[in-house]
Curated annotation (Swiss-Prot):
One GO cellular component, as annotated: cytosolic small ribosomal subunit
Source organism phylogeny: Bacteria, Pseudomonadati, Pseudomonadota, Alphaproteobacteria, Rickettsiales
Protein name (Swiss-Prot/TrEMBL): Small ribosomal subunit protein bS18
Chain's gene name: rpsR
HAMAP family hit by this protein: Ribosomal_bS18
Family in the record: Belongs to the bacterial ribosomal protein bS18 family.
Length: 102
């Protein structure tokens, strides 16, 4: 009653299941729920975005001097616009540098 089973076929099936589970893991990481906006706390403890606070604004600027995108900083759309405007004003008033030289 024992049948002769091809081991190459079993290996192919194992590889398919491994790929399938790896794809699921990748999707779970990709579709992971984002944390809330750090600048929009519901209890009112969120910092106020203003050009007068270069310490807060510098957290959202890269080493090169560019404004970090919202997908990196997890900031909501409206706060990202406020940040961008405040950073541009702070640059014009020489509170923040336009470019960081290394």
């Amino acid at each position: 009653m024992t049948e002769n089973i091809d081991t190459a076929n079993i290996d192919a099936i194992k590889n398919k299941t491994l790929k399938r589970t790896a794809n699921r893991a990748n999707k779970e990481v990709f579709f992971r729920r984002r944390k809330g906006c750090p600048l929009s706390a519901p209890d009112g403890t969120a910092p106020i975005i203003t050009y007068k606070d270069p310490d807060l604004l510098s957290k959202f600027i890269s080493e090169c001097g560019r404004v970090l995108p919202a997908r990196v900083t997890n900031v909501c759309r409206s706060k990202q616009r406020e940040l961008t405007k405040a950073i541009k004003i702070a640059r014009e008033l020489a509170l923040l540098p336009f470019v960081y030289h290394q």
